[in-house]
A protein has these predicted regions:
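Hydrophobic alpha-helices of bacterial signal-transduction systems
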Residues: 6-11, 59-60, 119
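A short, N-terminal "cap"/entry segment at the start of jelly-roll beta-barrel domains
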Residues: 1-18, 137-143
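Short, Lys/Arg-enriched N-terminal segment that forms or immediately precedes the first helix
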Residues: 32, 163-171
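N-terminal regulatory/effector-sensing and dimerization cores
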Residues: 17-111
Length: 196
């Protein structure tokens, strides 16, 4: 499909790819290539083609097509491509609150029972459709920050409706555990303290 209008306007817009820590990017990788990501942000990897090997201090994991992988902040993973492939990557420095029915206390109750281990999620059909829609925009060089923000909100709607609380607690544990424990502490005690 040919983009008919708008890209000329986007080229000089200050919101065209200005936020480098909160955005989707397409990453193509060759066989045996080492893959790295900034530790200053968290990253969700959507493997669309190929297979990668992830190593940490404890173990080695091999993951492939239709898997999502979360790399938390200050992660210490070594990643190597086992085959040629393509992934969609969402980098983020904060998480999005998109639904009033998803509150910190409910997620925290689920997370308190979790013993974390490296975990991936299978991309269910709505998540695959979502990833394809983001790739469509990236393939057509549409990098608008407003589109990026709307897609970042949309992904959490997909998580909300198509994954269980337990799946999400295991998957997002590396980035949510500290934030949610502090948030719950504040919400529980805010009436008892003079300042927060």
């Amino acid at each position: 499909m040919q983009i008919k209008n708008g890209l000329d306007d986007c080229a000089c817009c200050s919101s065209n790819g200005s936020d480098t820590h909160r955005r989707f990017v397409k990453r193509e990788f060759g066989q045996w290539e080492r893959i790295s990501f900034s530790p200053e942000a968290g990253h969700i990897l959507f493997i669309l083609e190929g297979e990668i090997k992830i190593e940490d201090a404890k173990d080695t994991y091999v993951r492939g097509i239709n898997q999502m992988i979360l790399l938390g902040y200050n992660h210490e993973y070594r990643i190597k491509a086992l085959t040629k492939g393509i992934m969609l990557v969402l980098s983020f420095t904060t998480h999005y609150h998109v639904c009033v029915n998803i509150n910190a206390e409910r997620v925290w109750r689920t997370m308190k029972t979790v013993t974390y281990r490296f975990n991936t999620l299978e991309m269910v059909p709505p998540m695959l459709d979502f990833a394809k829609s983001v790739m469509f925009y990236l393939d057509h060089k549409i990098y608008c920050d407003y589109l990026q923000e709307s897609k970042a909100v949309e992904i959490f709607i997909v998580y909300r409706f198509f994954y269980t609380s337990e799946e999400l607690a295991h998957f997002f544990y590396p980035v949510l555990y500290k934030d949610l424990s502090f948030d719950t502490l504040v919400r529980t005690n805010y009436e008892k303290v003079k300042t927060v």
